[in-house]
Amino acid sequence: IFSPVVLTVVSVATAAMLALTSVLCGCSSNAESSSQSGSTTPATVATDTTVKTTGEKIHINDSTLGEIWITELDGVPKNTLNNDNFTSDDTFKYYSENGKAASMEGIDISSYSGKIDWDKVKKSGVDFVMVRIGGRGYGSDGKMYSDDSALSYIKGAKAAGLKVGVYFFSQAVNNDEAIEEADYIKTLLGDETIDFPVAYDWEIIKDDDARTDSVSAAQATACAKAFCNRVKELGYTPIIYSPSKELYFKYDLTQLADFDIWYCEYANVPTFYYQF
């Protein structure tokens, strides 16, 4: 999470209706939409490398995966959040340190959210908004698409005094596609400025065949790095959105230390072992 404060995100279903979730909820995807075609160049496909670990086995009770064992990664900071410092009301979850607020509250939205009354959102206590700017379809052609409501959401949120970032639903299968996605975000934003990060949202597709099914952990990690490095070159702050499954089993976090994690978990308190 963006140090030094904890950021909590809830979803918007309709205008100013905020659904209670846990620390940092999930984003929306779009299977196949129009616009940009996917790259087929395999030149930057990563090869497997040896993940650096301490060798220690750690038992974790993950709210999504259940009880699992992981091998501790070497040099990756651990989660130091105190679960006793989390409180909640009917809408948000909060985090405090030494009796003082240490969190910001936010929402993630896409065109599925419909029309939004931004003044109501601001008055409800929301501090920031993460807007879906677009994504890539998970079908074989991997077409990129824009979210038709993104720019109007960004303008409306900024006018209401909210901080704004964006996220992109990725299904990149090589570094070239990840870089292509970052460049596409810049094209979509144009001259529109944002003050929160650009999030890379690469997810394992459930209950359907996907172009990313055979992507190795090494390649998934390389794609995340390529995207984030390109986002930095474009003048934005990158962040990696992910639930625990991808973080534990698809990303080598020892190679992603330069980038913050936007962690997704639907639970009363976060159970992820590493810092986010």
What would you call each of these model-derived segments?
Residues 105-109, 129-131, 164-168, 198-200, ...:
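Hydrophobic faces of well-ordered beta-strands that scaffold small-molecule active sites
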Residues 84-164:
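N-terminal carbohydrate-binding/catalytic regions of secreted carbohydrate-active enzymes
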Residues 14, 18-22, 50:
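Hydrophobic core
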Residues 51-106, 110-113, 119, 254-276:
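Functionally critical loop-and-helix segments that line ligand-binding/catalytic clefts
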Residues 90, 110-119, 143-156, 176-191, ...:
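Alpha-helical scaffolding within the catalytic cores
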Residues 188-198, 202-276:
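Surface-exposed substrate-engagement region within the catalytic domains
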Residues 2-17:
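Sec-dependent N-terminal signal peptides
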Residues 20-45:
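Sec-dependent signal peptide cleavage junction
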